[in-house]
Amino acid sequence: MRTAQALPLFVLMMVGCGGGPMEPVPAQPLVPPAASALPVWSRMELPILPDNVRHDTLLVHTTYDLGEGRFLMAAQHNDYNREGIRLYLYRPEPDSSAAIIAWSKPGYDSETMLPTFFTTGNRADGLVIIANMGERQSWGQEAFWLKDDGIRSLGFLNVAVREWRTLDDSTYQFRTSIAPRTEVRGQDGTFEFSFTGDSLQLYDDLQGRMEVMMPASMVRYRYEGTWQLWLEGRLVAPPPAS
């Protein structure tokens, strides 16, 4: 009973000395705002098709049928200029030429731009595309939003899956595509990209650390007018430009 009576007095004394009760410090959000409210975009499996156009200046890598007479191809100029591979939205013409509708930002020295597609099932929402970049290993994924005959770049998923492979008598680290482990949510131009599995490799945590291994559930990217990296439930601010 004495302890129960003394405790309120002690609290009152602390309040009196401090000039009033202290305001509680708001906790950092554990997830980006309204993360759970964003609808899920489902993976859309599109087979790679044979080339259906002839183009004098483009070397076609892969072709996909998006429906309604529109196709997407990953292609590069056959003079191998520095901009490298891109995604092209087009309609095939009767003479086998391509009527180009839109194109993505270039992949520069990447030798691959293998796309993975996500959809809400409503064509009006467009498609979210993540395109794997790399040469022999994955460098990460460029995220695009294909909507209204345009291909908008959202940002870069700077992550890959790390695997260990034994060749002859030596074991090597390989970085492979994160696409099979990527989940997409989005609505009205806001998108979130999260990852499944045990762990992933983050190439740059924007805090001075490179090639960091992290639990996959702790890494998230968000697009809401700007591209954001969230780690362990907190927004990471990139260092100021020097």
Regions inferred by a protein language model and the residue ranges of each:
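Structural signature of eukaryotic scaffold interfaces centered on beta-propeller domains
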Residues: 53-68, 114-124, 175-187
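Acidic, small-residue rich beta-repeat scaffolds with periodic aromatic anchors
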Residues: 18-56, 143-159, 164-242
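Sec-dependent signal peptide recognition
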Residues: 2-9
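Terminal domain-start segments
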Residues: 20-113
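Short beta-strand elements that form the blades of beta-propeller/WD-repeat-like
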Residues: 69-78, 123-135, 186-196
